[in-house]
């Protein structure tokens, strides 16, 4: 019997969302994604202490920010020994509103990968989907550096990223679901509001349909899943990045998977073009309470975890 994970791979490129690279091989993902929170979680495990300690030791004379960059590269390098495709490495969230600093940091990260013998075609630079982050991606893409736009919660962000020529976007399914469930309170009905009606699932479907209808080549990678149901409702999406625990659940399941998204079905979608000038972008994101709150919260969380990672490193110096 074919596993649900293997069936999903027939329709969608499966990506592993983890810094715990020792778990990767068993699921055979094509790509992998990381972020400061995942790396922070990984370095707290005993099996990654040697990599952390070696990185700190080898770069002890450098500023702590540089050591973090080297740690991200060390994790990315190990991941690329396992996955045949690409790894996503994130620019410090504290640069989310600084276009030039984001561009400079992306070039630094690519240069560091190059020093490890890893070509830029195997790396995606993750940037927050702020106006400034999207502008950074526009420049970087023209420089041949491929970008993964993260912390994406709205169609306005997705369209602006595609217009900027971003290689890939990561709309956050689970965090959208969390927001609507929390705000609904006792009115939330999982049977009614989950599954195909899940607000996070619907958001990704809308973005996917928009891209396919209007011919954008930017890849759509659903991210931030809470359940296997959310994943299976997006079977057929270009890519899905999935945590090891949910990959395991899919691996253990033999349920039959059906394709839910396809370019052909999306071309006739009832959807209008979205303006992408700065004023329209800022208004549309501001007008979406969920997108506004989750974007700002996401930046705060990633920034806080970067600071925690700095403290872990400082304690070893």
UniProtKB/Swiss-Prot annotation:
- Chief location bin: cytoplasm
Q: Describe which pathway this protein belongs to, using the record's wording.
A: Carbohydrate degradation; pentose phosphate pathway; D-glyceraldehyde 3-phosphate and beta-D-fructose 6-phosphate from D-ribose 5-phosphate and D-xylulose 5-phosphate (non-oxidative stage): step 2/3
Protein name according to UniProt:
Transaldolase
PANTHER family documented for this protein: TRANSALDOLASE
Could you tell me where this protein is found in the cell?
A: Cytoplasm
Q: What class does this enzyme belong to in the EC scheme? A: transferase
- Which parts form a coiled-coil structure per UniProt? none
**What this chain does, per the record?**
Transaldolase is important for the balance of metabolites in the pentose-phosphate pathway.
Against Pfam families, the record matches this protein to: TAL_FSA
Its Enzyme Commission number? 2.2.1.2
What biological-process terms (Gene Ontology) are attached? carbohydrate metabolic process; pentose-phosphate shunt, non-oxidative branch
Q: Which GO MF term does the entry hold, naming one?
A: transaldolase activity
Membrane spanning stretches = none
Which species does this protein come from? Paraburkholderia phymatum (strain DSM 17167 / CIP 108236 / LMG 21445 / STM815)
């Amino acid at each position: 019997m074919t596993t649900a994970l293997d069936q999903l791979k027939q329709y969608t490129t499966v990506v592993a969302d983890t810094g715990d690279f020792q778990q990767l091989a068993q699921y055979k993902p094509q790509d992998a994604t990381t972020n400061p929170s995942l790396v922070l979680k990984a370095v707290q495990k005993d099996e990654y202490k040697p990599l952390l300690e070696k990185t700190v030791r080898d770069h002890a004379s450098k500023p702590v920010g540089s050591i973090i960059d080297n740690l991200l590269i060390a994790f990315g390098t190990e991941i690329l020994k396992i996955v045949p495709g690409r790894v996503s490495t994130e620019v410090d969230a504290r640069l989310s509103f600084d276009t030039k600093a984001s561009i400079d940091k992306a070039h630094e990260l690519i240069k560091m990968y190059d020093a490890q013998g890893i070509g830029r075609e195997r790396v995606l630079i993750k940037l927050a989907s702020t106006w400034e982050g999207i502008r950074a991606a526009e420049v970087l893409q023209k420089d041949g550096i491929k970008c993964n736009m993260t912390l994406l919660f709205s169609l306005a962000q997705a369209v602006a990223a595609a217009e900027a020529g971003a290689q890939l976007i990561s709309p956050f399914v689970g965090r959208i679901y969390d927001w609507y469930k929390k705000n609904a309170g006792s009115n939330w009905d999982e049977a009614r509001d989950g599954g195909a009606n899940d607000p996070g699932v619907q958001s990704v479907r809308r973005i996917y349909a928009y891209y396919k209808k209007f011919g954008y080549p930017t890849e759509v990678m659903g991210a931030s899943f809470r359940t296997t149901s959310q994943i299976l409702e997006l079977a057929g999406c270009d890519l899905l990045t999935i945590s090891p625990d949910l990959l395991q659940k899919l691996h253990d399941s033999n349920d039959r998977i059906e394709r839910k998204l396809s370019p052909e079905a999306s071309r006739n979608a009832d959807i209008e073009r979205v303006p992408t000038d700065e004023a329209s972008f800022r208004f549309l994101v501001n007008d979406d309470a969920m997108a506004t709150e989750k974007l700002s919260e996401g930046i705060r969380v990633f920034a806080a975890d970067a600071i925690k990672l700095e403290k872990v490193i400082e304690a070893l110096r």
